[in-house]
Amino acid sequence: MIINFKKRGSKNFINLLIFLSVGFAQQSSHQYIEYQRIQNRLQQGWNTWNTSSVLQQVLLPQGFAINLAFKQHYFLEEQYLSSALIGRRGDFTETVRPGPHAYDGSYTQLEIQWEGLDARIETAHAGKDLVILISPNSIPHDRMKVIIESGMLWNRQGHLSRKINQLKAVCPGKIIKVFTTSVPVDDDPYIDVKTPYLAVWLDGEIGISTGKKRTLLEIKKAIEIQKVSLQSEAEKFGELAEAYIAVQAGIAWNLIYEPKFDRVVSTVGRLWNEEYGGFCTFGWDNFFLAYMTGLASRDLAFSNVIEHLRGKTEQGFIPNDNRGNGSKSFDRSQPPVGGIMVKEVYKTYPEDWFLKATFDDLLGWNRWWHRSRNNEGLLSYGSSPANNPFNEPVFETKTAAGYESGMDDSPMYIGVPFNKKKHTLELQDVGLTSLYIADCRALAEMAGILKRKKEQKELES
């Protein structure tokens, strides 16, 4: 249909634009609304959302935090542990041994050792409340305090206060109270805390609860309920139940709320997040994380895929790493497993909107490989000329090409030169080419479902 705008007048033209814009908005908002619902569901309740410490529980969407810190009292020097991370190294650092961790934070358990501290810390949901149990494996020789800190994160609105033996947070639409089974001590004003807190001696088991004051017995019962629930969920995997609990824990301890883009997303490790400005996602790792979370959670699987694809470069490829400080690996990608993993997630949760939301980004990445890494008929890993605003030293080197492979300094690349004219290793990589073919087949299958005949033909040729 041809419309004569001059004949029909500017008013009709404006009305048509409004009609068309509404139509397009409805078409695109179908994906946005569905995905926003996913994020709204994920951003609820207590969990180890803050990447800065595994000893901190945060309530979303309010952003209220309960942080556990420890103060060691020596006769001369005193030490203060305000945060803890898994795998941290160095003198006088904490050692954290992670235990089970449900994706939704309904149960977590870890062991921590530091400067005489040796304890197990468990947390659990009790309805919409949180309970925490600190169980010392031994009483420290030198006296130690547990500091129960309150906090409001990410500039969320709230008012914090302490009244005798409880903490209180007043947030929009919600009041949170925090209690402890131990007797608070106020003999030490020299504590490195800038918000209301409770300090108690670590001379036995310590219980912490929100909502209402609970006894140690009540806290232990709430924890046991969630432990049993986690075990029951794992039993559907049969003889692999314990393996599933371990895999879930490994992923869940690195699941965070990422405030820069207002999202819940899996990361590879909190130490990486700390080093790279708040978060770090990796080219192929995060697609594997999406697949693994999909064994139990549709919402996490979809979120991990969609958020990872949002990190693509202007050239259309998924970078080796994507960092919270704004830096990316602008010169290199990682193995093309995205289409394969997304197809597997779709097989578990066959929702066409999910394919529509991801297909074009995956196709763009697929085309980039053929365009940028074709080395006389087969593919090779490499590192391309690119803007380097953060002055990363490895651009256009063999080292960077190794990073693109995901195998970094593998012995397979000993003696293989880097061709600076081709920007690739002088190695036609059968493994990479095979993954690329598998990616083409996965995307062709997706194109067929979406009735994208032209793209399907391209991918099958």
Label the model's feature ranges.
Residues 2-4, 8, 13, 17-18, ...:
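Terminal accessory carbohydrate-recognition/targeting modules of carbohydrate-active enzymes
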Residues 22, 257-261, 375:
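Intrinsically disordered or highly flexible coil/loop and linker segments, enriched in small
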Residues 23-24, 297, 451-452:
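Hydrophobic alpha-helical membrane context
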Residues 237-348, 355, 363, 428-430, ...:
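Substrate-binding groove/exosite segments of carbohydrate-active enzymes
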